[in-house]
UniProtKB/Swiss-Prot annotation:
InterPro entries assigned to the protein according to its UniProt record, in alphabetical order: Nudix_hydrolase (IPR020476), NUDIX_hydrolase-like_dom_sf (IPR015797), NUDIX_hydrolase_CS (IPR020084), NUDIX_hydrolase_dom (IPR000086), RppH (IPR022927)
Cofactors named for this entry: a divalent metal cation
Functional summary from the UniProt entry: Accelerates the degradation of transcripts by removing pyrophosphate from the 5'-end of triphosphorylated RNA, leading to a more labile monophosphorylated state that can stimulate subsequent ribonuclease cleavage.
Domain Nudix hydrolase: 18-171
UniProt-recorded name of the protein: RNA pyrophosphohydrolase
Example of a GO MF term: guanosine-3',5'-bis(diphosphate) 3'-diphosphatase activity
Length: 178
């Protein structure tokens, strides 16, 4: 067990903090490529100091919200996409832990990491509906650009502490890229 200083300077034991329940979304186009956005870094957030900033959409599940509903809400809030159809839901939740220097700081200092339920969708719309900066509905922009990426490349594009999550997600949904 190792402790780290939180935002107040008090020591924070990661084991004492819960995982934040979240959803993750792999959106594939008709060519089997995956949508990835380059994160805008906010000082003190989980991406602060990172150079590998490409990620798929993800976000928190609101209290009482169904994960499938949360996935569609997060997708719209972050990308503006609505023209999607569900391909598959991962059977298991996937956890990641924040690196020690971010425990007690990132994720509002309340979580040790995230537990994520992943969904794969097919994008069936026109790319003109994709809006990231600004995204629709007055939501805060999380990405400054986006691209369709080969699925196999994703683990090497994400911040290192999320790499194992992306390796599991790619393994789960690999058959959908064919």
């Amino acid at each position: 067990m190792s402790e780290h200083k939180g935002p107040t300077g008090a020591m924070v034991d990661p084991e004492s903090l819960p995982y934040r329940p979240c959803v993750g979304l792999m959106v594939l186009n008709k060519a089997g490529l995956v949508w990835a956005g380059r994160r805008i870094v906010i000082p003190g957030d989980e991406m602060d100091g990172a150079t590998q900033l490409w990620q798929m959409p993800q976000g928190g599940i609101d209290k009482g919200e169904d994960p499938a509903q949360a996935a569609l809400r997060e997708l719209y809030e972050e990308t503006g996409m609505t023209s999607v159809s569900l391909l598959e839901e991962a059977s298991d939740w996937i956890n990641y832990d924040l690196p020690p220097h971010l425990v007690g700081l990132a994720l509002k200092g309340k979580y040790r990491g995230q537990t994520q339920k992943w969904f794969a969708y097919r994008f069936e719309g026109d790319e003109s509906e994709i809006a990231i900066n600004p995204p629709p509905g007055g939501h805060t922009a999380e990405f400054d650009c986006w691209e369709w990426k080969p699925m196999a490349d994703l683990p090497n594009l994400i911040v290192p502490f999320k790499r194992k999550v992306y390796e599991q997600v790619v393994a789960t949904f690999r058959h959908l890229a064919a």
